[in-house]
């Protein structure tokens, strides 16, 4: 379960940095192309709106929902805080969810586990 927690933490940290405009998204080893594309699209929409997001999240709890040889589903509770700011730094909005419940789906391919999808706000 610690490996799954590390993988999800890696995703959350990299996604957060990317949506804040800090660097590129570099997750192809642990996240499916579909999720990476979704995140890039979200950032491109933010750029058009001249905003960025600062996201702080912390895993509180992970429960295994189901597991097969090629798929793992976990339910995760997060402390989640998202701030939306204009490129000038001006505050726009803030969302705080404690906890935010998210279902993460991991798939096994090319000899490793990857995050393939998630559903938040359960």
Question: What annotation goes with each model-predicted range?
Answer:
Residues 1-55:
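Core segments of small alpha/beta cavity-forming domains
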Residues 19-20, 60, 121:
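Amphipathic alpha-helical interaction segments
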Residues 58-67:
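Short amphipathic beta-strand and strand-loop transition segments with alternating hydrophobic
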């Amino acid at each position: 379960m610690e490996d799954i927690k590390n993988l999800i933490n890696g995703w959350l940290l990299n996604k957060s940095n990317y949506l804040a405009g800090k660097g590129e998204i570099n997750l192809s080893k642990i996240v499916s192309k579909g999720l990476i594309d979704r995140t890039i699209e979200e950032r491109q929409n933010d750029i058009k709106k001249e905003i960025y997001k600062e996201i702080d999240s912390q895993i509180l709890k992970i429960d295994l929902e189901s597991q097969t040889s090629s798929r793992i589903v976990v339910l995760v509770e997060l402390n989640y805080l998202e701030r939306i700011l204009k490129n000038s730094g001006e505050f726009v909005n803030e969302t705080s969810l404690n906890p935010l419940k998210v279902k993460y789906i991991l798939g096994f391919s090319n000899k490793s586990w990857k995050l393939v999808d998630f559903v938040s706000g359960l």
